[in-house]
Amino acid sequence: MVLNILLAIVGLIVGLGLGFVIAKSRHDKAINGAKISASSILENARKESETLKKEALLEAKEENQKYRSEIESELKESRLELKSQENRLIQREQTLDRKDDSLEKREGSLEEKEEKLGARQQLIDEREKEVENLINQQHQELERIASLSKEEAKSIIMKSTEEELNHELTLMVKESEQRAKEESDRKAKNLLSLAIQRCAADSVSETTVSVVTLPNDEMKGRIIGREGRNIRTLETLTGIDLIIDDTPEAVVLSGFDPIRREIARMTLEKLIQDGRIHPARIEEMVEKSRKEMDERIREYGEQAAFEVGAHTLHPDLIKILGRLRFRTSYGQNVLNHSIEVAKLAGVLAAELGEDVQLAKRAGLLHDIGKALDHEIEGSHVEIGAELAAKYKENSVVINAIASHHGDVEATSVISVLVAAADALSAARPGARSESLENYIRRLENLENISNSFEGVDSSFAVQAGREVRVMVKPEEISDLESVRLVRDIRKKIEDDLDYPGHIKVTVIRETRAVDYAK
């Protein structure tokens, strides 16, 4: 047992020794391998460092060479730029030298001129003194000869100069007015002639009577009735006078209201056709005729509105418009006149680029007040403007109605066009006529207005009152004053007279020289 233990211990010791020897041998081999590897690594590192060192030296040399080339190039460019600047400075110095020489020469010339101007100014001052002395001597001599002071002579010269300037100014104004008038007349004639060519209207004559044809003369007695009951009833209900005379188979209806006269005519024709004529039947027929008349008036208004393209008129305004069919002004039917004015205003508005439909509407309604002027207090212009405002018409239409006779200032081009179309429609030949009494009174007023001015010798109304010729006294009225006189007469006629169309005023100045040979 002990032996086994000893053997085990000996074996352990031997094993440990062998293990140590083997481990030491391996350790030595590892150390030698590491030394060899380290030597190899050091050698490789030395070689690589030498290679990197050489490459770095080469790169440094290349960079140095490149930098040196760039520096040399920049230096070369700087030298060239400096050389160029030096050349420019040399040229500028040369230019400045030349300018300096020129300025020196100019200064010398200016000094020389200054000396000459000084001498000339001195000479001028001396001559001015001489002239002033001569003028004073002449003034003294003139005052002695003319027995006038300097202020009196100055006043005479100023007055003469003022008269001469006024004369020239009047001539210039006259020439300017003539040129403007000729140009405006030419343009207006072209525009109005175009409008007239595109518009045609009927002419009618004013009448205050209507004639009803009878089938026979026996019907006259039936119309009169027993003790005149029928004729009195008809006259009372219609307000129209029935004239029954010796005219065969005819009865005359007389009255100044065309609507009532038309109702009476319609009633009488119905009674004649029916054959039953008595007061009750007359009342029935008058009422029926009035209803038919209201319908006809509405149709006339609608037809007029349709003809000019006014499609949105108020129904009440259409009825009032239709009443114009039975109104006349100086013999011209007012509804036809309104339609004509609407068409003319539309043509003029189209030529000037204005609203054609609005111009037609304003032209159609411009005399709407005449339908009610005998029922409502006020002028037809005021009534028409109030009606247009009441029925919410456009402000341009209201102003056109209010301003077409010049009572209110026109605020739009359409208002002016409506006034022009109204004057054109009224003034065309044959459009209007007037009674003999009014005609004679107008001629007398024309002559009286012309004769009221100082310097007028006589005046004559000619061309049916469309022209007044004024003869002036040549010793009191000069040619230039006659121009002012004709304007004054025209203004007074416009302010004092009411007339259709326009009136031409002609002032005639005549100077006669008479002598006798013996």
UniProtKB/Swiss-Prot annotation:
Q: Give the matching CDD domains.
A: HDc, KH-I_RNaseY
Q: Any idea which UniProt keywords this protein has?
A: Cell membrane, Endonuclease, Hydrolase, Membrane, Nuclease, RNA-binding, Transmembrane, Transmembrane helix
List membrane-spanning regions.
2-22
Q: What class of enzyme is it?
A: hydrolase
Q: What is its EC number?
A: 3.1.-.-
Q: Which GO terms describe its cellular component?
A: plasma membrane
A GO MF label: RNA endonuclease activity
Instruction: Using the UniProt record, give the first listed, main subcellular location.
Output: membrane
- HD domain sequence ranges: 334-427
* Cellular localisation: Cell membrane
Any one GO BP annotation for this protein: mRNA catabolic process
Its domain of life reads Bacteria
Domain KH: from-to ranges: 208-268
Q: Where is this region: Disordered?
A: 91-119
Give membrane topology per the record: Single-pass membrane protein
The family assignment reads: Belongs to the RNase Y family.
Task: Spell out the HAMAP family in the cross-references.
Answer: RNase_Y
Known role: Endoribonuclease that initiates mRNA decay.
Name the record gives this protein: Ribonuclease Y
Its source organism is Enterococcus faecalis (strain ATCC 700802 / V583)
